[in-house]
Amino acid sequence: MSKKQKRSTINDLKNILETIEKIDRFIENMDFEDFSEDEKTLFAVSKAIEIIGEIVNHLPQELKDRYSLVPWEDIYGMRNFLVHNYFGSDQDEVWKTINEDIPDLKPIIQKILSEEMKDKQTDKPE
């Protein structure tokens, strides 16, 4: 991976983490009932999940292969589900994603980011 690709990948991983943190802020102190009745939050969280999926789709295949235990296809699949669900988000599925999948994803992305940043520091100049 070139230095430019590495820098772009690191920025993408940081953007995923920032988006996860936004989701955390959006749903802070909410239960499912509050969430399902709050159209703005449902829309914002759905959009954030779409963004994460889109970033994942553009990560280098080399990185995805190296971290093959990460459910990259499922992450992008959720993005597709939300984007193509024209008649409104499935609140149950979004709630499940933000309470079960996103919390598991955050430490994984943090670890990958840490490793990629460490690798960047040890890369030889081009």
Regions inferred by a protein language model and the residue ranges of each:
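Solvent-exposed interaction patches of small proteins and small membrane subunits
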Residues: M1-E126
